[in-house]
Amino acid sequence: MALIRLGFGRQHFCLLKRRSFLMLKLAALVFAVVLFCEFLIYYLVIFRCDWPEVKTPASDSGQKTLKAMFLADTHLLGEVRGHWLDKLRREWQMERAFQTALRLLQPEVVFILGDIFDEGKWSSSQAWADDVERFQKIFRHPRHVQLKVVAGNHDIGFHYQMNAYKIKRFEKVFSPERLFSWKGINFVMVNSVALEGDGCHICSEAEAELIEISRKLNCSRKQERRSGPCPDPQLLPASAPVLLQHFPLYRRSDANCSGEDAAPLEERGIPFKERYDVLSQEASQQLLWWLRPRLILSGHTHSACEVLHGAEVPEISVPSFSWRNRNNPSFIMGSMTPTEYALAKCYLPYEDTVLATYCVAAGLLVVLILVHSELLPSPFLFGWNLLRKFKT
């Protein structure tokens, strides 16, 4: 009787040991997959990105190079259209991507080209405060890194939705600054939603600001065309500006855009609507005439595109930074001096890569459980038996 009990005890102990070993293997697999998909993959992908080099090295010209990051259309979900799981997944992706980029690339300034929020155009005061708090957590940054934000139509509404309250609410958090100069480089940040051209109060104020900026820029270059006298004791750096805005300048469509992150082929030929998809032709010509930029960066379309205006001014449409808008989000890295610039694109992890990794891991979990339950032969045992049959 004692021997029987001892046998049952050993059998029970072996069963518990096998189960514990299985649970340990399952836990290790789950931990490894989550660690890879939610942390390590961002380092592996962004580590491959590097700052481009300007044609004339800053050390040779005596100019300092500014490292600037440009991203667009983060679209943080609000309380109305934002499902909690969608919020959690997409905001975690952007947080890990942004924090990893800051750590590995160490930019000096980051520009976000509008549509920071998805529901800023209609959110209540409390919802706005909640969205801002989440934004500040996701895009937190060291004090030595500057973060500049341009307003988009989802932040303050389209022209007929925006009002002074929404604009002041936005500028209270992100500053009303329109002209930013650093290391001899001028950046002009335009509220492109206000360039409707219908003479509304907000539009008139925006145009007056741009005319004043144009005067200052012309004075710095000692070209007073349409700018009036130059009494300012402190001139801006004598450098053509970089224009930053949410809406792209006028173009008929994305038909001439190319690349893996351009709009889908079936959408590229769809004509753009002025004042909705792009700025009007009149507003676009005014900006080019007033500011005479050397480079334009914009967002809004969620897809990449490179356009040349007037045969000399390039515009880069920056794709969305969020998985919610694209499977292959990215951002632009710019090495800039007062006279030169070089741009490179840095892709983030593809969403379908992460999902495929989770699916493969789930399949392995099922196989391990079936093998343990003896519902499926061990792969090693199956291979050994197959080899023996082949030999015989």
Swiss-Prot record:
Molecular functions per Gene Ontology: GPI-mannose ethanolamine phosphate phosphodiesterase activity; manganese ion binding
Transmembrane segments: 25-45, 352-372
GO CC entries: endoplasmic reticulum exit site; endoplasmic reticulum-Golgi intermediate compartment membrane; Golgi apparatus
InterPro entries: Calcineurin-like_PHP_ApaH, Metallo-depent_PP-like, MPP_MPPE1, PGAP5/Cdc1/Ted1
Cellular location(s): Endoplasmic reticulum-Golgi intermediate compartment membrane
Gene3D superfamilies, A to Z: 3.60.21.10
Cleaved signal peptide residues: none
UniProt keyword Transmembrane helix, yes or no: yes
Bilayer topology: Multi-pass membrane protein
Record: residues binding a divalent metal cation 1: D115, N153, H246, H300
Chain positions recorded as a divalent metal cation 2 binding sites: D73, D115, H246, H302
Cofactor needs: Mn(2+)
Key words, A-Z: ER-Golgi transport, GPI-anchor biosynthesis, Hydrolase, Manganese, Membrane, Metal-binding, Transmembrane, Transmembrane helix, Transport
GO biological-process terms attached to the record: endoplasmic reticulum to Golgi vesicle-mediated transport; GPI anchor biosynthetic process
Keyword Cytoplasm among UniProt keywords: no
EC number: 3.1.-.-
Cofactor note: Binds 2 manganese ions per subunit.
Broad class of where this protein is predominantly found: endoplasmic reticulum
Family: Belongs to the metallophosphoesterase superfamily. MPPE1 family.
Quaternary structure and interacting proteins, as annotated: Interacts with GPI-anchor proteins (via the GPI portion). Interacts with TMED10.
Purpose of the protein: Metallophosphoesterase that catalyzes the removal of a side-chain ethanolamine-phosphate (EtNP) from the second mannose of the GPI-anchor protein intermediate. Participates in the glycan remodeling steps of GPI-anchor maturation to allow an efficient transport of GPI-anchor proteins from the endoplasmic reticulum to the Golgi.
Record protein name field: Metallophosphoesterase 1
Organism of derivation: Ailuropoda melanoleuca
Gene expressing this chain: MPPE1
